[in-house]
Amino acid sequence: MPIGVPKVAYRLPGESTPQWVDLYNRLYRERVLFLGSGLDDELANQLNGIMLYLSAEDASRSLFLYINSPGGSVTAGLSVFDIMNYVQASVTTIGIGFAASMASFILAGGERGSRIALPHCRVMIHQPQGGMEGQASEVVLEKEEIVRLRRLIGRLYVDLTGQPLSTIANDLDRDKYLSAREAREYGLVDLVATTETATV
């Protein structure tokens, strides 16, 4: 039985009396964001809007993006990646549970030195996928777009991980699963968190 989003007390800056706000709004005020489901345009737009707002409010304070997601839309993921790199506030990414497909790409796209995986996080990378249907000319165009996106994602993974393109291309050919430690060795994250390294 779902319990809904709990309410928590929060005192807005300049207010003397706390208000009851939902948990996620409280966490947003602390600059904590979640990618906790499949990524589509709606969720990407919500994350992007929150990052833009919080960065404009105070670019000197980091944002913390917790990721537990099977991935999702390539274009939605690229929009989150671009906004993370566009905003002036640094974005720390933290993998929790499972970061797969575009979610692993977003995890790797955090601020260098601030890409973290919790000890039991699993990470999976693979090539962009898409279903093709329609007239033959449309299928050809869609296939060309998938190939273009695959090359783009491959080049970006090279930049993010330091792995050679040949390794990335080979590893993207099929689902590649990594433990938190293996993700660090691969260059997808910089740190495997422990209780001593936890920040938020």
Curated annotation (Swiss-Prot):
Pfam families associated with the record: CLP_protease (PF00574)
Reaction(s) the record says it catalyses: Hydrolysis of proteins to small peptides in the presence of ATP and magnesium. alpha-casein is the usual test substrate. In the absence of ATP, only oligopeptides shorter than five residues are hydrolyzed (such as succinyl-Leu-Tyr-|-NHMec, and Leu-Tyr-Leu-|-Tyr-Trp, in which cleavage of the -Tyr-|-Leu- and -Tyr-|-Trp bonds also occurs)
Gene Ontology cellular component list: chloroplast stroma; endopeptidase Clp complex
InterPro entries assigned: ClpP (IPR001907), ClpP/crotonase-like_dom_sf (IPR029045), ClpP/TepA (IPR023562), ClpP_His_AS (IPR033135), ClpP_Ser_AS (IPR018215)
Keyword ATP-binding recorded: no
Enzyme class: hydrolase
EC code(s) of this entry: 3.4.21.92
GO terms under biological process: protein quality control for misfolded or incompletely synthesized proteins
Keywords of the record: Chloroplast, Hydrolase, Plastid, Protease, Serine protease
Subcellular location: Plastid, Chloroplast stroma
SUPFAM superfamilies recorded: ClpP/crotonase (SSF52096)
GO MF entry, a single one: serine-type endopeptidase activity
Catalytic residues, chain numbering: 101, 126
Signal peptide: none
Function of the molecule: Cleaves peptides in various proteins in a process that requires ATP hydrolysis. Has a chymotrypsin-like activity. Plays a major role in the degradation of misfolded proteins.
Subunit-structure text: Component of the chloroplastic Clp protease core complex.
PANTHER family membership: ATP-DEPENDENT CLP PROTEASE PROTEOLYTIC SUBUNIT (PTHR10381), CHLOROPLASTIC ATP-DEPENDENT CLP PROTEASE PROTEOLYTIC SUBUNIT 1 (PTHR10381:SF15)
Family: Belongs to the peptidase S14 family.
Name under which the protein is recorded: ATP-dependent Clp protease proteolytic subunit
Gene: clpP
